[in-house]
Amino acid sequence: MRSTMVIGATAAALTVAPLLAQQTFRTGVDLVHFAVVVTDKQGAPITGLTPEDFELVEDGKRQTISYFAEGDPSEGTKLGNALPLHLGLALDTSGSMEADIREVRTAVVKFLNANESAADVTLVNFDTEVRISRYAATEYQRLIERIRMQKPEGWTAFYDAIGVYLHGAASQNGQKILLVYTDGGDTRSAITLHELLDLLKASDVTLYVIGYLEQYPSSARTEQRMQLQRMALTTGGQAFFPMSLKDLDKVYEGIQREIAARYSLGYVSSNTRADGGWRRVQVRLNRPDLKNVKIRTRPGYFAPYREGSGR
């Protein structure tokens, strides 16, 4: 286990610039990676698709898919070498979690036991402070012990927790997924929601948020739901809002099914300018026989920046 880093709110002065490097994998060329979920009209993941079933378009220009994988990265790929899966878990341990922490811990541990394909797991506990530690796949027992030992107290540095995780994930090559559990809004962070959305847009992390908001009045609950949904959709992820803690297992099982059904698409952009600019990406399906299909992925990426590159 790596040592735990404790970060106070004033230390989380985060910017977008360091995250631009994580838009590509360093493989001799700049390979841009997109995690894609395809669902039917009932929201169930569609599996068994091939590279030929997809079309990737960047700023209106079709791109050639050079990397393709479905589901568990350990099971190999159809194009390219397998990319490792880096999993992040961010858990709200603020004072308001005192009554619910046992049920939340139990659901998280069940989820971890069902996810054996991750190369490592980064645990982020957040209350007044943010604590982050990373565990190899062989250290799951230590990770579970760490989850169980946290005691709820303090405020909620929610935005800072995600921002700190994103900066740590910038040094990782591969697929990156962050699951966040919270029971409320931010009350402590140094960064704002707008700044966090910029960080999420600049990352290649897929965010899943579970918000248990039943203690809020309806107007405040609606506002919180909209914020969490916006955060998740910025990355191609999802937000979930269980009405009871008894529903947590079902939510985590749904996330696990989606992770197992995700497609990983990679390509080398035909635009060779390293100008740091935003590039809009669309993923389409070349399967007329599949009706009412929804495709979820991030909306684009920032190109890498190298000084002297023309615009």
In which residue ranges do the predicted regions lie?
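Scaffold/interface architecture of coatomer-like assemblies
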Residues: 20-311
